[in-house]
Amino acid sequence: MSSHGISDQVAIVSMGCTPFKEHWDKGADDLLVDAVTQTTAAVGLVPNDIDAYWLGTSQSGASGMMAAGPLKLEGKPVSRVENYCATGSEALRNAAYAVASGAYDTALAVGVEKVKDGGYQGLNAFPYPTDGTQRTLTAAAMFSLVAPAYARRYGIDEDDLRRV
C-alpha cells in the first residue's frame, strides 16, 4: 500500500520566528514565548487555544516543561523531540501527523536553542554509542567537511551551496 501523504489533511496557518542573532538579553524561554506569541497572535489565538505542542530542542531543555512553564499552558500536552539537525522538522512532522490522525484539531511545533547561556562555546559533539573512539568534531564542523565533497559529487557550484 503506497502512502499518499497528509497534505490534504493539514494546513499550516501561521508561523513566527525570532531574529537569528545573539540574544544576550533573553533566555531560551523568552525566545520560545516570543515565537509562539507571534505565531498565535497572527491568527487571533493565544497559546492556550492550541490543543497540543511539539517542542524541538537539544541543548535548551530535557522535557516539555521547557515550553509548558513559560507559556503557562494548563492541561496541554507538550512533547519534546530531538533529532540532531532535523529537530525542528521532527517537531513539525509530529504536530502535522497528530492533526492528520484526528487526535487534535490544532497543534503547534516550536523549536528553540540557546547554547551559550549554558556555558557552551557552540554546539557540542553529541555522544552516541560507537566503538569508543572519541569524537572531536561538532555537527557544524562535520558538515563543513562534507559540503565540498557533496558539491563535487553532484556537480553543484560551492558558491550556490553556500547560499542555501
Model-derived features with residue positions:
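Short, glycine/charge-rich beta-strand/loop segments that flank catalytic centers
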Residues: N83-T87, V110-V115
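Hydrophobic or amphipathic alpha-helical targeting/insertion segments
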Residues: A96-V110
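Aromatic/His-enriched, Gly/Pro-containing loop or helix-boundary segments
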Residues: L73-N94
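Conserved "HGTGT" condensation-loop signature of ketosynthase/thiolase-family condensing enzymes
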Residues: M1-S79, V112-V164
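Short glycine- and Lys/Arg-enriched binding-loop motifs that mark or flank ligand-binding interfaces
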Residues: V10-I12, Y84, A107
